[in-house]
């Protein structure tokens, strides 16, 4: 669910913050099109991911606000004949309020598309991060060395370790 997803983003953001603090002054090459372009800091580089994931979190929160309305009492689309205080029931169930229009309540699924979009954006940002982990762990870059716990051996080269978790997540 959206709340759980935000929790995972919070954990990831905390890790990114720690990395930024630890590497605030550490210089690294900045790249454009996989070519060295200009110097930057590791903190600045991770700051880009921080901004991406903050926007992702914000999108989830915005979507939650729009989804937190109760359709109870909307019926098939024209409401119900039962004497129901929809606002009171909505509040008791923890919703912000009852939906305004019963037809819209039961016939539109835009909230699903919005939530899937949020998840797609998060996936894209995670994929980008995982791709960098793979690159940075490669022999060509050599910026990081992942623990054997997060690596698997190569089928063809016995001395090479692959960042399999990152590849699968990507």
Locate each region found by the language model.
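Internal glycine-rich alpha/beta core junctions
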Residues: 17, 38-160
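Long, non-coiled-coil amphipathic alpha-helical linker/lever segments
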Residues: 1-38, 99-111
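Histidine (H) residue identity feature
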Residues: 23, 33, 44-45, 125, ...
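Single conserved hydrophobic/aromatic residue that forms the stacking wall/gate
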Residues: 157, 161-170
């Amino acid at each position: 669910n959206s709340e759980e997803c935000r929790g995972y983003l919070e954990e990831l953001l905390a890790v990114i913050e720690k990395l930024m603090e630890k590497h605030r002054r550490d210089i690294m090459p900045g790249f454009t099109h996989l070519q060295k372009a200009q110097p930057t800091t590791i903190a600045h580089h991770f700051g880009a991911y921080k901004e991406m994931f903050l926007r992702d979190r914000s999108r989830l929160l915005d979507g939650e606000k729009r989804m937190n309305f109760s359709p109870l009492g909307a019926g098939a689309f024209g409401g119900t004949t039962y004497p129901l205080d929809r606002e009171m029931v909505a509040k008791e169930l923890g919703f912000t309020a009852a939906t305004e229009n019963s037809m819209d309540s039961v016939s539109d699924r835009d909230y699903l598309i919005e939530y899937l979009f949020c998840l797609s954006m998060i996936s894209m940002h995670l994929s980008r991060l995982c791709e960098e982990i793979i690159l940075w762990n490669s022999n060509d870059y050599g910026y990081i060395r992942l623990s054997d716990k997060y690596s698997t051996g190569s089928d063809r080269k016995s001395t090479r370790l692959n960042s399999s978790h990152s590849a699968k997540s990507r």
